[in-house]
Amino acid sequence: MVRLPPPTPPRKPNICGTSGNSNGINENIDTSTFSVSAAKALFESAKRPEVRNAAIAAAKNPFVRQTAKNVAQDEKARGAVLNAVKDPSGGNKISAAFAVADANRKSDSVPPPPPHRGGTSPGKLSGSHSAIRSQLENMHIGGSVMSSNSSTATPSYQSNSTSSYSSSAPVAPPPVPRHTQSIPSYSAPAISTPYGIAKFDYAPTQSDEMGLRIGDTVLISKKVDAEWFYGENQNQRTFGIVPSSYLDIKIPLKEAFTALPPRPAAPSGSSSGTYATAIYDYNSNEAGDLNFAVGSQIMVTARVNEEWLEGECFGRSGIFPSQFVDCPNLYQVPMKQSAPSSAPSYSHPITNNSGPKQTVTVSYDYDSGVASDLRLFEGDVITALEDIDAQWLLAECRGQQGMVPKTFLGPPYGSPKKAPSKGIAEIACAFSPKKAVATGDYHSEDPKHLYVTRGDHLLIVEDVDDYYYKGKLEAFKTLPAGILPKNIVKLEN
């Protein structure tokens, strides 16, 4: 990637205003006033290939650029250099060298200018910026930079296709009931991955950059180029790229990959090697949660319940919502062992492999778009292979195996499908519309479902089953009614 030099700083008045000789260009140049002969000598010298090549090489060297800036800003160093130019004696050259070194030492406490990324208007990506973003997305790193104020919404009942990641994340499910299940406290482990400490404050100028404050700890996951790193700010819980010159590197990337620490043992019975890919950013302030950015690879160690998983990412452990990740082999991950409960068991025994297997009729069409789930149609007959838990079944249909929700099946797992829905006229007689308010978002692309946003006023026209209502938006009564889940609806008295 070609990087342009930074803009030339404004010239201090009278820096070269003292008359004297300019050794190497024209010893008779009068610098106190404008001189045509001096200008001519300067341009003639610049035409020489060796002078031009030396100037270009010096301009490309960041150390030379920074040194020139330090000298220009330091009055003592500036005077010493001018004296050495006027009178190139050995003493003046030594004095100038010490003055330049002193100016460089003084500049150590000042943050270096961030690497140039090309001019862009706010919110618009430059060519180099787009190239960096494209590289990160191809490596599944930070396709969307996590913001510290990212919001969440009610989980969508329409599963997302794994072929394209959406930036509109679902809302995390209700927190794990911590008074009924023993969830360990996941304290931050000692850092053993590549990381650095911020030496200076840095305010991001583009959407994929990450802000820094002095002392912030940054976990480094990728070297974008010679001047930029991609990583996570553990203090601010944000992801993005930062200038490498702003970090004091404690564990470099090379050292970390040549001497990886041993991975902690997975919980007993866990399926080591089961990985999930984050399809949304997850940023939680809850202690014990595992935060990550879209595209992150997470090792799933256990299922806490039907909506929460436990895993590891970037050397950290915690729990996270299952609908924020894509995990094709999720059914292979065992449930986390919890204290014995007196609650009744909802599992249905499956006949062992030596005898005939149980068959079940599908009551509703099911197509979640998730690779590990079966695609089923009403009336299909499936073979039950394994009872995963109270809500999911591993089954086989048309030579394919996958997960199926029990609520979409007939007896003995689900309920028989109700009679076909009545017409609008019959509904008006048998079920008077009830007013309700949406307590969450339900954004489905299925034309049979109602697109609802939190706060919408609804008219419920039919109680479909134990899980769904049929209704319409009160503001659009003339439009057809659609299906929506009961758990995001609050009926008004």
From Swiss-Prot:
Pfam family, one: SH3_1
Stored PROSITE patterns: SH3
Keyword line: Repeat, SH3 domain
Gene Ontology biological process: actin filament organization; cell migration
Record's keyword annotation contains Metal-binding: no
Domain of life: Eukaryota
InterPro entries per record: Endophilin_SH3RF, SH3-like_dom_sf, SH3_domain
Region entry Disordered, spans: 1-28, 102-130, 142-187
Biased composition (Low complexity): 154-170
Listed Pro residues bias regions: 1-12
SH3 domain boundaries: 191-252, 271-330, 355-414, 431-493
Compositional bias (Polar residues): 16-28
Alphabetized PANTHER family for the sequence: PROTEIN CBG06887 (PTHR14167:SF107), SH3 DOMAIN-CONTAINING (PTHR14167)
Protein name listed in UniProt: Uncharacterized protein B0303.7
